Amino acid sequence: MIKTNIKISFGELRDLYVNLLAVANKKLPIRLSHVISKNMQLISEEVHLIDDCRIKMAENYADKDENGEPKFNDNKYIISDENAMKFNAELNEYYSTTTEIDIYKTSSNELNKLEEQRYDGLSPSEIGALMIILDEESDTN
């Protein structure tokens, strides 16, 4: 396992967390499971801050009731079409903000172990999502 520093946008970081969460409960080789868990711990606080800011933006653009509180429908903010365009533009700009974070990587050889019956398989999209935490040049012990 190698710790490395990368530049990543807020949107990519949020997507990485969602992708790691999606495979975290699968039966995977222990080194791969470990690096997934370590990365989830490393980035979870930052992702929660990103989501808190997204929620504040949504509250700002949401239609308000007579008390000035955001309106909801099915646990979603009600946002007018005009404000939705502004919200999406601001959110996209926010998600493009770049940050530096440390992540852990493991050998891409760990994927070869997925062929064993005792492990769950991963779809091509799941493997693609994990590429950022795989190091093709190392053979970690």
Question: Model regions: which residues?
Answer:
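N-terminal interaction modules that seed assembly of large macromolecular complexes
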Residues: 3-63
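Low-complexity intrinsically disordered segments
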Residues: 53-141
